[in-house]
Regions:
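Glycine-rich beta-strand-to-loop/alpha-helix junction loops that act as flexible
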Residues: 93-95
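Catalytic core of pol beta-like nucleotidyltransferases
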Residues: 1-89, 98-104, 113-187
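Short, well-ordered beta-strand segments
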Residues: 108-110
Length: 187
């Protein structure tokens, strides 16, 4: 979180910048980085202010590690953007979207294909296989792609499929029509 600023930040500000619900987890990581000298702590009577020590030999490596999630999202989005025609919608869902993924988790990707994309099923299948292989190569995690057509998506909504509720609850939009707008339009 501190890589985004050149200013000192309080513990609360670091937690907000980290974008996580776990203040204890952020505090433990921050304190470990202070112990290692990667983060500098400036103690004041009312607060301790933290600053990334950009001169530390491990600072760049730590910044790269902190950006892993964003880099994965960027790569998947770039891969999808190269498709012709582009998907109507694409988002990440499941444990990765919730920030709970482990080394054994799949990276779940919802890709909704419009009629033009569904017309050439062989080309579409090849693109899906390539994206799945790319995700595995980039992350070591299997890319699990769910690819409903608009008709199938409408049927899932009509059947009150629990997967739709899961998508509504936690997803990361990648491209195309926003998920909630898409769900409203096909229901």
């Amino acid at each position: 979180a501190l890589e985004a600023t050149a200013a000192r930040a309080s513990g609360e500000q670091v937690h907000k910048m980290a974008g996580t619900d776990s203040p204890d987890g952020v505090r433990r990581v921050r304190d470990r980085l202070v112990t290692q000298g990667i983060v500098l702590a400036d103690v004041h009577p009312n607060a301790t202010l933290y600053l990334l020590n950009r001169d530390h030999v491990a600072a760049d490596a730590n910044v790269a590690l902190a950006r892993l999630r964003a880099m994965i999202i960027e790569r998947i989005t770039a891969g999808l953007s190269s498709w012709s025609p582009e998907p109507v919608h694409a988002s990440l869902f499941g444990s990765f979207a919730r920030g709970e993924a482990t080394t054994t988790s799949d990276i779940d990707i919802l890709v909704v294909i419009g009629p033009a994309g569904a017309a050439d099923q062989d080309a579409q299948a090849a693109r899906m296989d390539q994206l799945s292989a790319d995700v595995l190569r980039w992350t070591g995690n299997r890319g699990h792609i769910l690819e409903p057509t608009l008709d199938v998506l409408g049927a899932m909504i009509a059947a009150d499929d629990p997967l739709v509720a899961s998508w509504r609850a936690d997803h990361i939009h990648l491209m195309g029509t926003r998920l909630l707008d898409l769900l409203r339009s096909v229901s």
